[in-house]
């Protein structure tokens, strides 16, 4: 009985936990994060506000005024008059082959540099990574000259309605061609993809490769049937990043594609700007519609994207 009776006394004698003291450093950190989120959301919210507002009202009252009407006319106008589905298809013709070729080439280089010991593997890896340190603006003039003087054969075209995809080239040159813009993206994205995939492949033990060699598999079979399935999370994460990087490109498409009908959707937005008048409300609606595909890709590959970033950070 004494033991049972003593239990409530012990509970009554316990001290209540002290309230956590709010430190000034934590307050400053939260204030900084809130300010960063506000700065990031402001352009997006402003674009949504401008896209929902009629341009006539903006011209009369200015951008910094309370809206009288909000509607989706700018979205419907951009979808129909700017032929948005055509430029979506135009962009996918550039992005999808560029992502696939970049992943294949980068995974091959990363596989050779991490799973085999040879004399210059580190040098080769550093050369691919060093390509990302070169500003694209440095090579504009020589690259533009190369594109204007590189002959490319033509093997006909694939015509689907208004869309016409030339097999290699329709003018005999690398300039103003889908293949040219695809190649430049592959060249500039392979270094970063090689760096990420090589770090991930370092977590794969070399005993797996050696066992496959003993079983009679050649190097190409090991890369395709053994290494790539193990790197699926990293490949999905890399595919998401590459899709976003290439899809959002404005510089290379504006420089290397002369024909407006061949440009991707990001650089095609510049075609809406007139010589004497720019409908910023319509451009804001177009920019929001152009952002939909990367969001869909990220949501679809989000699970693999997060797994690829976390699994590649530890070894073993």
Task: Give the positions of each predicted feature.
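A structural signal for multi-pass alpha-helical bundles of membrane permease subunits
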Residues: 20, 25-316
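Short, Lys/Arg-rich, polar N-terminal cytosolic tail immediately upstream
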Residues: 1-22
């Amino acid at each position: 009985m004494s033991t049972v009776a003593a239990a409530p006394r012990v509970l009554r004698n316990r001290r209540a936990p002290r309230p956590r003291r709010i430190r000034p450093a934590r307050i400053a950190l939260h204030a900084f994060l809130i300010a960063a989120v506000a700065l990031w959301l402001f352009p997006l919210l402003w674009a949504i506000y401008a896209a929902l507002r009629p341009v006539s009202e903006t011209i009369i009252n200015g951008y910094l005024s309370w809206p009288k009407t909000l509607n989706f006319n700018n979205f419907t106008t951009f979808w129909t008059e700017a032929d948005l589905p055509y430029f979506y298809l135009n962009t996918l013709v550039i992005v999808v082959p560029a992502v696939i070729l970049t992943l294949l080439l980068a995974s091959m280089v990363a596989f050779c540099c991490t799973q085999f010991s040879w004399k210059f593997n580190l040098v080769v890896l550093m050369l691919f990574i060093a390509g990302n340190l070169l500003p694209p603006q440095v090579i504009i003039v020589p690259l533009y000259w190369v594109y204007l003087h590189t002959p490319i054969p033509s093997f006909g075209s694939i015509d689907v309605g208004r869309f016409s995809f030339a097999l290699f080239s329709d003018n005999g040159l690398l300039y103003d061609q889908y293949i040219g813009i695809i190649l430049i993206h592959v060249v500039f994205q392979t270094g970063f993809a090689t760096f990420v995939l090589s770090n991930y492949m370092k977590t794969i033990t070399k005993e797996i490769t050696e066992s496959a060699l003993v079983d009679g598999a050649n190097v190409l079979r090991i890369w395709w049937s053994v290494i790539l399935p193990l790197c699926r999370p990293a490949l999905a994460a890399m595919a998401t990043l590459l899709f976003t990087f290439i899809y959002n490109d404005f510089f290379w498409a504006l420089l290397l594609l002369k024909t407006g009908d061949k440009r991707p959707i990001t650089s095609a937005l510049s075609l809406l700007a007139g010589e004497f008048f720019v409908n910023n409300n319509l451009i804001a609606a177009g920019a929001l519609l152009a952002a939909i595909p990367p969001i869909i890709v990220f949501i679809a590959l989000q699970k693999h994207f997060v797994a690829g970033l976390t699994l590649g950070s530890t070894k073993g």
